[in-house]
Amino acid sequence: MNSGFHLLDYLVLIVYLGGMVGLGVYFARRENSTERFFLGNRSMPWWAVGISIFATQLSAITYISIPGKAYETDWAWLVYNMGIPVVGLIVIFLFLPAYRARNITSVYEFLENRFGPAVRAYGALAFIFMQLGRVAIVLYLPSLVLFEVTGLPLELMILVMGVLVTVYTVLGGIEVVIWTDVVQTVILLAGAVLALFLICFRIDGGFYEVISIGGLHDKFQMVHLDTSVSKDLIWFILIGAIFTNLVPYASDQTVVQRYFTTKSGRDARRCLWLSVLIVIPSSLLFFFLGTALFAFYTTHPGLLQEGVGNDRIFPFFIVKEMPVGLAGLLIAAIFAGTMSSLDSSLNSISTVCVTDFYKRFFYPHSGDRRCLALARWITVIVGIIATALAVMVARSLMGGSGQNGGAHGAWDLFIAVQGLLGGGLAGIFCAGVFTRRTNQIGVAVGLILSAGLLAAVKYGFQWHPQTFAAMGILVSFIVSYLVSCISKTVPET
């Protein structure tokens, strides 16, 4: 049993963080153009890109909140991740050919090709705001872990994380983002496996006792027969699994940008297949980890302190129960989760700002060297903004008292942010790929009605967060197409 963080734990964590910055320094010597900074010269290995896509979507939310969710409730949310391979199939055969057929850097260039520059600008802005909300949450979670470990102010921990990620992303561009994602994925998954092994070792009866306790308390239940629109029903989770995951895989620059870093369309398909197939074993691992934590504290009730919320149960176990040295490795794994998402967001926001705004609307003939310098400065600015927003999220979720303020915590907030801001935008991408008659007027009306409906549902009816993306995509897609059919504006081709 470990009563706290020791010198060896700090050394392990420092070596990991230093290694990530070292990779940034190494790749900084090669980042001499925007083509390399944004796309890795379109020559990245498909398997590394696939792991990077997986890591980008993984985040510390998966590492902390999903085990916490399984600990608190059951496996109902496993269905959500099982829908990702279905989304991968849709994107590979329908969206990817449309994107790869165009020699583009930003996915929002596709929107201009179909609907004009105004829609492109809207899509890019919506992406930026959605990512800022997302990075605030994924930066908050690992900083919470450091708060638990060291007792230092939470805001200081957020600052440390924000600075380190910003530094290596500024230095190395998309290449360092992809290769650090590979390293971070290995560390993160290895850490989860190690934690699960040690939990089972500490329980009399081991793995089979975890199964027994989990079954006795219905922890493996995946289907809830209920009619409430606010519960974790399989109906809402199944619907949300398809539509919510369609948002990042079809319309989010952090993911779609990876498709453009590969050498060919074949490699793009292979990287996407790899990224979605890894989801299945990793999801089973993280949900079982949460059930194992429940079994551990059921058999060792005296070790659980009062007031430890579901979002903090895994970090609490790491700090209190992991052997010296291994605790540092597990904390490094949590850092890997957040850094793999945060670096992707910083680089992609920089890509969008330069490609979709600076070069498109302000200085189209600006030299590549100036654009590269601007991209780095934007990365710094976005890193500062993300850090400030993470402080605000921490104060909100912690309720100002150091305790988690909600039963569902950061995971549900993340889903709500993605559904509310991304659903309507993804619907417009669907209209661009699946129809030819949709035009600018239809897009505008569809986006307005979609946003209005989502706001009403979110603040007026308190429906399940999993319904947000589905409603946003369907309303945006259907309304934009129907309005276009009765309008006289000729769509862009």
Q: Language-model segments: what does each one mean?
A:
Residues 1-493:
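Membrane-embedded helix-loop-helix hairpins and adjacent transmembrane boundary segments
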